[in-house]
């Protein structure tokens, strides 16, 4: 079982990998290599959409608990190359202001980075043109991201700064929890599903839900990184997410997770997080019991100074994303606590009956 230091190393390695919707191969390869080193305990398979499912070997005595995280992040995909002129499309949600003359880094098949400047971008078609600093062996299908200069960051004692915390920090947390669960009989039903193309409408999750990539009786813990706000700050603990902009999640499952965090005195927050929709919505829509867990995220989708930009006051500067290290470790702990807790019952009626009996005299 890995220690906290090793888990932070996985976090640093994963969140530094270039990825984009539909071209997540670097992340998937990292995970496959990680799983291969644990082949005595784990199985790994890919569904027809390219999502990866990691399960524990041995007999399962309870319905699965599946932590779901996505392997993509908003990014550029090369569509054409003419010497130093590179045509790109952008996949994911970023405000138009951040594209104006931005520096970017495109990666070839050997993982070498090639820098350039975005000289044209149409937010309607989400297509643009990059002028490279020098010619490079790029081909259609290669991917890119913002170039942060000396601000790429790393994992420190308090914070992690990285190109893609969303949702590769979630991937790291899910794998860390799975690594801890190995060999623990009471956690043998914990597994991990890593999805693709979340940033363009959680397409991979929809495919997994439609095809029943995980059994119908699975309990889904959908992991996200969600924009931090004053009421959901970095360092306040991982968030038990009761719903999103599209749906409210399974109330009993959500309450069981919250109660597990409370009983174990795990620092956490409980919020709706209605700023967007997440993969839990897809699983709920297709009949699964699902709830959400998320990490508060600074510089959401690499949009630095976002609050000021939204108010028309700040400079739209692409920056590395930021999460709290204590939130990250707390999420790993919460995943395992939730796995043990979800087979319980949440009987609110009994509590209300007791309250009624003790206070009904007030009604006269």
Model-derived regions: residue spans:
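N-terminal hydrophobic/helix-forming segments and targeting peptides
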Residues: 1-364
């Amino acid at each position: 079982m890995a220690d906290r230091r090793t888990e932070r190393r996985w976090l640093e390695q994963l969140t530094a990998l270039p990825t984009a919707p539909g071209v997540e191969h670097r992340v998937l390869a990292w995970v496959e290599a990680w799983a291969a080193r644990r082949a005595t305990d784990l199985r790994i398979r890919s569904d027809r959409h390219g999502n990866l499912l990691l399960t524990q070997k041995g007999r399962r005595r309870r319905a699965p608990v599946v932590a779901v995280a996505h392997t993509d992040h908003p990014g550029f995909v090369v569509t054409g190359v003419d010497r130093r002129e590179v045509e790109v499309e952008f996949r994911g949600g970023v405000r138009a202001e951040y594209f104006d003359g931005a520096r970017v880094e495109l990666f070839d098949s050997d993982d070498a980075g090639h820098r350039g400047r975005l000289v044209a971008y149409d937010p309607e078609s989400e297509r643009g043109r990059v002028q490279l600093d020098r010619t490079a062996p790029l081909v259609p299908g290669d991917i890119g991201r913002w170039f942060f200069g000396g601000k790429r960051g790393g994992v420190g004692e308090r914070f992690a700064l990285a190109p893609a915390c969303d949702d590769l920090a979630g991937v790291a947390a899910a794998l860390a929890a799975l690594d801890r669960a190995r060999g623990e009989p009471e956690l043998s039903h914990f597994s991990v599903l890593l999805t693709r193309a979340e940033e363009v409408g959680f397409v991979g999750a929809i495919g997994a839900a439609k095809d029943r990539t995980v059994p119908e009786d699975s309990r889904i813990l959908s992991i996200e990184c969600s924009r931090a706000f004053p009421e959901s700050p970095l360092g306040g603990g991982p968030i038990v997410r009761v719903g999103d902009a599209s749906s409210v999640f399974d109330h009993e499952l959500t309450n069981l997770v919250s109660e597990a965090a409370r009983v174990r005195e795990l620092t956490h927050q409980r919020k709706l997080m209605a700023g967007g929709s997440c993969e839990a919505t897809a699983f709920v829509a297709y009949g699964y019991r699902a709830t959400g867990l998320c990490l508060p995220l600074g510089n959401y989708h690499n949009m630095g100074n976002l609050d000021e930009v939204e108010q028309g006051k700040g400079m739209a500067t692409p920056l590395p994303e930021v999460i709290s290290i204590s939130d990250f470790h707390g999420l790993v702990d919460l995943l395992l606590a939730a796995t043990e807790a979800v087979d319980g019952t949440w009987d609110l009626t009994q509590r209300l009956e007791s309250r009624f009996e003790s206070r009904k005299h007030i009604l006269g």
